[in-house]
Amino acid sequence: MPEDNSAAVAQGTDVSFPQDGPNSGATIVRTGGSTFNLTAIGTYQVLFQVSVDEAGQLVLTLNSGAGAVEQPYTVVGRATGTSQIVGMALVTTTVVNTILTVRNPAGEPTALTITPSAGGTEPVSAHLVIMQIA
């Protein structure tokens, strides 16, 4: 399995999720290593997990055509240690083809180092689950 994010994720940069998992249709479409198209207007539940080496935060962004906008109510983080940053949020789109990303917020003081073999010798993957719920 290729490693996720072999380079540090700089401030204001999106986390890559290079491994595809199960897909249940055409409502949520991968458009790049870090971008996902929410093709229908609606509410989506987003769950993400990223193993990192330092304290930091992650935030969801939505881009409905005018540039990616960080969604402040989705910020999650941790203060110390080497472990996972885990987040879950509901996001609502108001236009079709809104692009979703998970980002190291622009105002953060440091880049995030993604841990490629957290807890052992097997490669681990950052996880992202997106489900349309309404």
Across the structure, where does each feature detected by a protein language model lie?
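Extracellular jelly-roll beta-sandwich "head" domains, especially the C-terminal globular C1q domain
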Residues: 1-134
